[in-house]
Swiss-Prot record:
Biased composition (Gly residues): 229-238
Residue ranges, annotated region (Disordered): 228-267
Alphabetical GO biological process terms: riboflavin transport
Entry GO terms, CC: plasma membrane
Function of the molecule: Plasma membrane transporter mediating the uptake by cells of the water soluble vitamin B2/riboflavin that plays a key role in biochemical oxidation-reduction reactions of the carbohydrate, lipid, and amino acid metabolism. May also act as a receptor for 4-hydroxybutyrate.
Record-level Gene Ontology MF annotations: 4-hydroxybutyrate receptor activity; riboflavin transmembrane transporter activity; virus receptor activity
Catalysis performed (reactions): riboflavin(in) = riboflavin(out)
Keywords, ordered alphabetically: Cell membrane, Glycoprotein, Host cell receptor for virus entry, Membrane, Receptor, Transmembrane, Transmembrane helix, Transport
Domain of life: Eukaryota
Biased composition (Polar residues): 254-263
Protein name: Solute carrier family 52, riboflavin transporter, member 2
Glycosylated residues, chain numbering: 129
Pfam families: SLC52_ribofla_tr
């Protein structure tokens, strides 16, 4: 087979990146739009905790994909990917007209439409973890790095939309003689949340079109069954075997214990993972619990006391730190377990300070000062950026273990996210451990 031209390779990398962009764009878009929608939805400051639980429950999508593989073994990933993309496009498109629709349940008003559609999108995004990567596992490692770059874009592009939308500003009216101020005056955003969800739908349509373009450029991928097809396109790519061997060596047992051809998906294949690989899986689960469950649940409590501007910037810049960490990992990849552990400890220290701010809400340190606002925004960006780098580096190292390692990595991510979200739901939504701060009211005055 003739070597592909440079133009074809560049186009393939672009399509792979756009394909990866659609993996978590829907949920990331909802997170960065929270500063806007939280003003109109009855859940208020508890909404991030609700969303964390819904995203964790989206792990049911993994069960659906597993059932598909049992009922249709060897059929490949094309149909599940198309279903995932269809759910993402339709769910996001329905958010545009329905996100403000409210329903009375048990005597209380809830944003049932918004939460239900978020759950559908969570199902699709969680299922993408176990459908997209197996489809691309037959490609050489450079294409997989383009895919991870695309996953970074799934956070960056919604952030760009949010920045273009503008920060929700408000003006506090002068306090009258009796000392009771009137309601705050909100300034409208440049465009509505409905328009934001419409633009997000367009991004998901582009991602789905990129997948169809991949099927046209790489027709051999469609006919290769999922089971036992680990070699795929790798054999014809110069230098790929050497690179994969280099990436696999930190995680695999000695060659005498891993002498098989391609890893099989049965449980015995997990013996390919070494003790170091198990430590990496634990690190991946821990960072996922913090970034996908614990920290998002308290982001509003830690940043909103410093103002809506601080909250919006913390959400947007925190999400934008993800693709920046991906860029860094593409150039500088930490392969040391001690180094990754040290970075995780640094991120944990940042997260502990942010958790302390949430506990001390509505009167955390430096509230009402520019220094406090800058500090909380910078710490959110650094904390999520450090954890994102650790997750990317850990996943890259685990990729060397083959399909069993990728499966274990996906399970670790989802289990960690679930545990983090479930842990934070009672203190935020049931016991009300964290206290919110009302606009234009200063509860910190002596």
């Amino acid at each position: 087979m003739a070597a592909p031209t440079l133009a074809r390779l560049v186009l393939t990398h672009l399509l792979v990146a756009l394909f990866g962009m659609g993996s978590w764009a829907a949920i990331n878009g909802i997170w960065v739009e929270l500063p806007v929608v939280v003003k109109d939805l009855p859940e208020g400051w508890s909404l991030p905790s609700y969303l964390s639980v819904l995203v964790a429950l989206g792990n049911l999508g993994l069960l659906v994909v597993t059932l598909w593989r049992r009922l249709a073994p060897g059929k490949g990933e094309r149909a599940p990917i198309q279903v995932v993309q269809a759910l993402s496009v339709v769910g996001t498109a329905l958010l545009a007209p329905l996100w403000q629709h409210l329903t009375v349940m048990a005597g209380q008003v809830h944003s049932v439409a918004f939460l239900a559609l978020t759950f559908v999108l969570a199902l699709a995004c969680c299922a993408s973890n176990v459908t997209y990567l197996p489809f691309l596992s037959r490609l050489p490692p450079p294409f997989l790095r383009s895919f991870f770059l695309g996953q970074g874009l799934s956070a960056l592009l919604p952030c760009v939309l949010a920045l273009g939308q503008g920060v929700g500003r408000l003006e506090c009216p002068p306090a009258p003689a009796n000392g009771t101020p009137g309601p705050p005056l909100d300034f409208p955003e440049r465009f509505s949340a409905s328009a934001f969800f419409g633009a997000l739908t367009a991004l998901l349509v582009i991602s789905a079109a990129a997948f169809q373009g991949l099927l046209l450029l790489l027709p051999s991928l469609v006919s290769i069954p999922t089971e036992g097809s680990g070699t795929g396109l790798r054999g014809g790519a110069p230098g790929v075997e050497e690179e994969e061997e280099e990436e696999a060596s930190p995680l695999q047992e000695p060659p005498s214990q891993a002498a098989g051809n391609t890893p099989s998906p049965d449980p015995a294949a997990h013996r390919l993972l070494s003790a170091r690989g198990a430590c990496l899986l634990g690190l991946l689960a821990t960072t996922s619990a913090l970034t996908n469950g614990v920290l998002p649940a308290v982001q509003s409590y830690s940043s909103l006391p410093y103002g809506r501007l601080a909250y919006h910037l913390a959400v947007v810049l925190g999400s934008a730190s993800n693709p920046l960490a991906c860029f860094l990992a593409m150039g500088i990849l930490c392969r040391s377990l001690a180094g990754l552990g040290g970075l995780s400890l640094l991120g944990t220290l940042f997260g502990a300070y942010l958790m302390a701010l949430a506990i001390l809400s509505p009167c955390p340190p430096l509230v009402g000062t520019s220094a406090g606002m800058v500090l909380v925004v910078v710490l959110w960006a650094l904390c999520l950026g450090v954890f994102s780098y650790v997750k990317v580096a850990t996943s890259s190292l685990l990729h060397g273990g083959g399909p069993p390692a990728l499966l274990a990595a996906g399970v670790a991510i989802q289990v960690g996210s679930l545990l983090g979200a479930v842990t934070m739901f009672p203190p935020t939504s049931i016991y009300r451990v964290f206290q919110s701060r009302k606009d234009c009211v200063d509860p910190c005055e002596p």
